[in-house]
Amino acid sequence: MLFRSKIYGPKGIGALYVRRRDPQVRLEPLIDGGGHERGLRSGTVAVPLVVGLGLAVELAVRERPEEALRILEYRERLHEGIARRVPAIRLNGPPGDRLPGNLNLSFADVDGEALMMAMRDVAVSSGSACSSASPEPSHVLLAMGLDEDVARASLRFGLGRFTTAEEIDFAIEAVAAAVARLRKKSVAWTTQDGA
């Protein structure tokens, strides 16, 4: 399955690859009628969206090496900048084998949801988009062996094609300021800090 949002394609389209011979999964139509695509889809496909998705795929393939390197540099700049300004953070996941545009950090004695709300001008998440309504900690972080408190203290930063150096620097400052404000209110942090 190809999600257009991951490659900056037009809204309203995606792609599903199904091998022709002996598919492992039997597909059922979502909407009956029309008989298009061997009875799996009804209605006419919007040709401009198909062309747009094709162009997005072409651009993603062509620009991937340079884009991945640039995004990786920004991710490292963000991580190192936050690490310099904010004590007691933890990188969630392996330091090496990671997607360039994904940074997940835990902040000791800070609730991830509260931190996210304290940084209204920085787009971050405390879980995946598909589980954003769930109050539970990230099942992925728990499966990685993090305890619930650490998982709840985590934020995910997503970087992409349109991320700028100025946004990285702004995010570093916003995270540092918000964590400092929240930790001042944290009994666990102030007790540990000796304040």
Enumerate the predicted regions with their spans.
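Thr-Gly-centered strand-to-loop micro-motif
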Residues: F3-R4, L27, L40, G93, ...
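A general structural signal for well-ordered alpha-helical segments in protein cores
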Residues: P10, Q24, V47-V50, R75, ...
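Anionic-ligand binding region
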Residues: G14-L16, R38, L78-I82, P87-A118
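Generic structural signal for well-ordered, non-membrane alpha-helical segments
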Residues: S42, A46-V50, R64-R75, G112, ...
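PLP-dependent enzyme catalytic core of the Aspartate aminotransferase-like
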Residues: L49, P137-A195
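Structural signature of PLP-dependent enzymes
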Residues: A56-E80, R90-L99
